[in-house]
Amino acid sequence: MNIIRNKYIAALPLAVASLALVSCNDFLNKYPDSRMDLKTSSEVSQLLVSAYPAAHPAYLTEMYSDNTDEQMHSTWSAFDRFQEQAYQWKDIDEVRNAETPYQLWEAHYTAVATANEAIAHINSVNNAHDYDAQLGEALLCRAFAMFQLSTVFCQAYDKTTAQNNLGLAYPTEPEKVVGRLIERGTLAQLYNNIEKDLLQGLELVGTKYARPKFHFTKQAAYAFATRFYLYAQQYDKAVKYADLVLGEQPTDVLRNWTEWNRLGPSGNVQPNAFVMASNNANILLLPVPSEWGVISIPTLLGSKYAHGQLLSKTETLQAAGPWGDSGNEMLYSVTYNNGVSKYALRKIPYVPRVLDVSAGIGIPYSEFAVFNTDATLLERAEAYALSGQYDKAVNDINAELSVFTKKKTQLTLDEIVDFYGSLAYYTPTKPTPKKR
C-alpha cells in the first residue's frame, strides 16, 4: 500500500506540471491587457479614459504655497508625514499618499504611456483617418499630462531663461525597453513639444462623447490652450483661444454664483454642485484619488497646516479689495469651525470609494474642475494686463465681478491702481494681499 501511495503521490506533481504547462501556454498566447489588442476606434476611445492623469497636485501645491500657515495648538496635528514634509519644504520620501510627488509623477507618466499606446495603434492602421477624433484626444491628453508635470517639477516658464532650465523627458512612443533613458532636454523644448501636441490635437479632437465634460472637447482644448499660452508668455494667443471659449458675452457662460451660494455648505451639497457636469461653466472635470476634499475643509484632519483665520481675513477670502470687504461683498460663504483654524470655500467634493465594506477599506476621491469659464476669463484678463492692455483687463475683471459680487460691483482702472498703490507690502507681522 505504501508503494502504491508513493507512486501516485510521485505522479501527482507531474500531472499538475503538465496541466500548468498547458495553462501557461494558453495564458502566454493571450495579450496581457486590452491595450495590446486594439481593433476599433471605439476600443481606442475606451483606452483613452485612462489617458487622463489619476492625480491632481492641489494638495501638494497648497502645502507649498503661502495659502497655508502653521496653526499652533496642542490638539492640532499634521494629517501625516507627507503633509508635514510638504509644508516644511523637506524632501518628501512618503510615497503611499496619492498626492505625493512620486505618485503625481507616476500617474501623469502612466497617462502619457496610455496616450502613446493609442497613438501607436492609430499610426499602424490603414484607415487612420477614421481615428482622427481619438488621435486628437490622445495628443491633448499627452500634452496636458506633460503640462501638469511641468508646473510641479520645473521652473516657471520664462522665455528669457527657458533655454537654460531643465525640462522633462517627453515620451512619444510606447516603451519597449525596460529602463530606457530619455533626455530631459530644456524647458523650452518641453514647451515646444507640448505646443505641438496641443495644436495638432486641437485640430482633430471631436465632440461625440457619452460624458463630454470628462474628455477633451474643442472647448476644453481652447481652455487648455488659453492657460498654456498664458504660461508660455504668448499673450496674444492666450487671448485668441479664450475668445473661443467665452464668446462675445462672457457673462452668459460664467458660473451662477448666486445660485451656488444659496446651497448649504454642509456635506457635499455645494461641492457637488460646483463640479456638476450639467453646469455650463465647467469645461473639463477630473475625478481622482485625493484627500484634499476633506483635509482642506474645517475638520480636525490635518489642522496643524491649514488656510487659517489670519490668512483668510488679511490676505484671501475675507480680506479687503478694491471692491470692498471680500467676506461681505462676494457671493460665497466662508466655511469655518470654531474648533480649528481652517477657512475654506466648498468647491471640492470628497467621496470615499469603498473597496472592502467589512474591513472598512476605501480610497478617498475628489473631483476638480480643471478648466472652467470663470478661470478662463481671469486668465484672459491676466494676458491683457501682462501685455499692457489694461482697459481690456479691467473689462474682464468687471465681467467676473458682475456675477461674483452681491452688488454687481464695477471698478475703474484708477480705482484698482489707487487701492493697490496705497496698500502696504506684506510683512509677517502686518500681512496684506500685496506681495513682492
Predicted feature locations:
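Sec-dependent bacterial lipoprotein signal peptides
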Residues: 1-24
